[in-house]
A protein has these predicted regions:
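Disordered, acidic Ser/Thr/Pro-rich linker "stalks" and the adjacent N-terminal cap
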Residues: 23-95, 103, 114, 124-133, ...
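Hydrophobic transmembrane alpha-helices of multi-pass, membrane-embedded glycosylation machinery
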Residues: 520-525, 532-545, 667, 682-691
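Exposed aromatic-hydrophobic patches
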Residues: 133-141
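Primarily membrane-embedded glycan-assembly and transfer machineries that use lipid-linked glycans
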Residues: 180-506, 510-513, 541-677, 684, ...
Length: 774
């Protein structure tokens, strides 16, 4: 490598010389006085600033082009009407003129003070008609003062100022004509700096190696540090960051993690990867990805009452809080009926007749209906409640109506309602019955998921290793299947089933088969499809039985099975016992028809075509009208692909440990089920298919096949950035489906090839060679 050549020849001196020249050149540079007069503010730093980002832009001597966009890197941003900037002019001086450039449709006020405490109004600048950034000025001032303050007074809430100048003596040419530049949109600046940060981190990984001089390591370490600070500053200035920017942060975190895996896995023996660099980049990318999962900390949902963003996932909680808390009265089918009945009683002037044309979904059939068509059911639903329970329901419904706003509250009656199993309903019923719907309580219950995340990530780090934990965290936060609005952050216990799968795999990794069975069964009874993990966990034992039959031409005895397959038996017995107990308890609590209703609902959801599904069925038949006819016409292809993936998983699991076998079942979730996009979050657990070795520092931590699995998943996260640019949501999810199955195919092939290379499928290779020779 080039760096190794430089180190060996002591070529650091010229690098320091170049760096010193650059620093001196930068230090000597100062922006010119663009005003051509005595600008009292040029180059000054404010003595006080509140609620303003990019404040240095106000006095740097560079203005925006007239008519330019308001949200660029040339402008300082004022958060609201309370934001202000104050400058100390150094002494009491006369002021005869002020010039500044700002967005056209906002009003600003300048104030003056001699002591910095008591300010008097100096000049009010009203909005102008011309669009974009516009110059404003006055030469009619005749005051003295030491402290000058500027603040917006009213406008559209988006306040931007590019440059400010104040004069004791007016220049010969006034208004002035400063140096101008075309600004770059702040969101573009964010994306650029995020890309540069990712590039700097990757460069740091490949520019360092074990044994490199300490000065070189520190110098290289400055690259991601400076780039990271720059990216953070741009995000802070552009806040809130648009969805495209958040998605690029996700892709960047995945790119850094992929580079770390690649650097360590394929490091030349002469220049091994610097372990501290790999660990640092993996850890940083993991934290960034999880932060991106939470939209970089910006609440994603809207509080219609305060007209402010809220972290509470109102759309999800409206469905599940009421369904779970009042399951005795409304079950899976009656929520919208009760919502309309409560609405009519609560809203003055609202009647079923006036709302008769309002659309709603009939949760008993899943077809679109209207309030007029459902009138008889709406009038009857109140009879299911006691008077006390009905008043409680109305209070809870009123909370969601006020928070969502009446228009959205009625509009979202087109959703399909809660579809969790009676097991999850029972857990949520116990939790939600403890409080009346309110934001504080939902914020607290919303912390249950992050606590589960932290526990699960820690368990993965303990059981599988630090690298595995980081890659899982990156894929968890960097995959974009969930998208805005479907992201369950801010909801309550919506990722529990996912974390239980991971905890089950951790238990199996530590040899706690019964505990693993408990967690996998708990996940399965909450969301059904995780039962595939129990099926796939049995595949290695099926291989063993087949091999035993081929070798001995008889079945093994029960004693032999108990001795050689004890972990699997403990897993299955614990899973069966857990499932039976949970189903029995929920049946006693809700009655058996509750399970029947749930089966019907899931069957209906799985049968109806959905634009946001990410599954093999959608890959083959698309999402448009005529979905079923197309699926039937292409059934040979559909069936062949199912066989391909199932057979691939079966071949991949010969002689594999239980934890790998269980996780491999998740590959089949979008193959067997018509899964919605948010359930494809299971991909975050697929890094557990790669087994990180723990041994000497010199030993490779991953096999090439396992490393390929990690790289495939990280590349999937990177590639999803381009799907975010597709605004047609059905097409977006179809492209996401294409990417998913490309990744799953690569993973299955890597697993099978790994088995072939390690001799686990020698019998199959020999059989195929014999057939070919024949």
């Amino acid at each position: 490598m080039v760096l190794g050549w430089l180190f060996e020849r002591g070529a650091g001196g010229w690098l320091w010389s170049v760096l010193l020249c650059l620093l001196l050149g930068t230090a000597c540079h100062h922006p010119p006085d663009a005003s051509g007069g005595r600008n009292l503010l040029l180059g000054k730093k404010p003595s006080a600033a509140s609620g303003v980002s990019g404040v240095s832009r106000l006095t740097d001597g560079v203005a925006a082009l007239t008519g330019d966009d308001w949200e660029t890197e040339l402008n300082a941003m004022f958060r609201d009407e309370e934001a202000s900037v104050t400058y100390d002019l150094g002494a009491v001086v006369p002021i005869h003129g002020i010039w500044f450039e700002t967005d056209h449709n906002d009003d600003y006020r300048f104030m003056i003070s001699e002591d910095g405490v008591v300010f008097e109004q100096l000049w009010d600048s009203p909005a102008t008609r011309a669009g974009g950034m516009q110059d404003r000025w006055t030469d009619k001032l005749d005051v003295t003062g030491r402290y000058l303050r500027i603040q917006p007074t009213q406008g559209d809430g988006r306040y931007a100022v590019a440059e400010v100048a104040a004069f004791s003596e007016l220049p010969k040419v006034f208004p002035i004509e400063p140096a101008r530049q075309r600004g770059t949109a702040l969101q573009t600046v964010v994306r650029t700096r995020v890309l540069l940060f990712a590039f700097a981190a990757v460069a740091f990984l490949f520019a360092t190696c074990e044994g490199a001089p300490l000065w070189w390591l520190y110098l290289c370490g400055l690259l991601p540090l400076v780039a990271g600070i720059s990216a953070f500053e741009s995000i802070n200035r552009a806040w809130p960051v648009e969805q495209r920017g958040v998605s690029l942060v996700r892709a960047a975190s995945a790119a850094i993690a992929a580079a770390a895996v690649l650097r360590e896995l394929y490091a030349p023996p002469r220049f091994p990867a610097l372990r501290a660099a790999v660990f640092g980049c993996l850890g940083a990318s993991a934290l960034i990805a999880v932060l991106a999962f939470y939209n970089l900390g910006r609440p994603q949902f809207w509080d219609g009452q305060t007209q402010q963003p809220t972290p509470v996932h109102l759309l999800d909680l409206r469905q599940y809080y009421q369904t779970a808390k009042y399951f005795d009265e409304i079950g899976y089918r009656g929520m919208y009926l009760a919502d309309v009945a409560a609405y009519v009683e609560d809203i003055p002037g609202a009647t079923l007749e006036s709302l008769r044309d309002t659309p709603m979904r009939d949760l008993a059939t899943h077809r679109l209906s209207s309030i007029g068509e459902q009138r008889d059911k709406i009038e009857a639903v109140k009879k299911r409640f006691t008077p006390e329970r009905w008043q409680a329901y109305k209070t809870d419904a009123r909370y969601f109506r006020e928070m969502m706003g009446q228009r959205d509250y009625l509009r979202y009656m087109l959703d399909y309602g809660g579809n969790a199993t009676p097991v999850w309903i029972s857990i949520a019923h116990f939790l939600f019955s403890a409080f009346q719907a309110n934001t504080t309580a939902f914020l607290l219950t919303g912390l249950l998921d992050p606590l589960l995340f932290a526990l699960t990530f820690a368990a993965i780090g303990w059981c599988f290793g630090y690298r595995t934990m980081c890659v899982v965290m990156v894929v968890f936060g960097a995959n974009d299947f969930i998208m805005y609005g479907s992201n369950w952050s801010g909801a309550t216990l919506r990722h529990d089933w996912l974390m239980y799968i991971a905890l089950g795999a951790c238990a199996l990794r530590r040899g706690r088969a019964a505990l693993g069975g408990f967690f996998l069964a708990l996940s399965s009874t909450i969301r059904a499809f995780p039962a595939l993990t129990l099926v796939s966990a049995s595949i290695p034992a099926a291989w063993w039985l087949t091999e035993y039959w081929r070798s001995h031409e008889r079945r093994p005895t029960w004693a032999q099975i108990q001795e050689l397959q004890r972990p699997l038996l403990r897993l299955l017995v614990a899973a069966l016992a857990t499932s039976l107990v949970l189903v029995a308890l929920t049946t006693l609590r809700w009655s058996w028809p509750a399970w029947g209703d749930w089966f019907w609902k899931v069957e209906k959801l799985n049968a109806d075509p959905h634009a946001n599904s990410v599954a093999l069925r959608g890959l083959v038949a698309g999402w448009e009208q005529g979905h079923y006819q197309l699926l039937m016409a292409r059934w040979p292809l559909y069936a062949s692909l199912i066989v391909f993936y199932v057979l691939g998983v079966v071949l991949a699991l010969r002689d594999r440990p239980l934890e790998q076998a269980a996780i491999a079942g998740l590959i089949l979730v979008p193959v067997v089920f018509y899964a919605a996009n948010y359930y494809i979050h299971v991909v975050c657990l697929l890094p557990l298919l790669a087994l990180e070795r723990r041994g000497s520092a010199d030993a490779p931590r991953l096999s090439l096949a396992d490393g390929w699995i990690w790289l495939t998943l990280l590349l999937l996260c990177i590639a999803q950035y381009w799907t975010v640019l597709v605004t047609d949501m059905p097409l977006h999810f179809h492209l996401a489906t294409v990417l998913l199955f490309a990744a799953l195919t690569a993973i299955v092939v890597a697993l099978v090839r790994g088995n072939v290379r390690e001799g686990r499928l020698d019998f199959l290779v020999h059989y195929l060679q014999t057939k070919r020779a024949a």
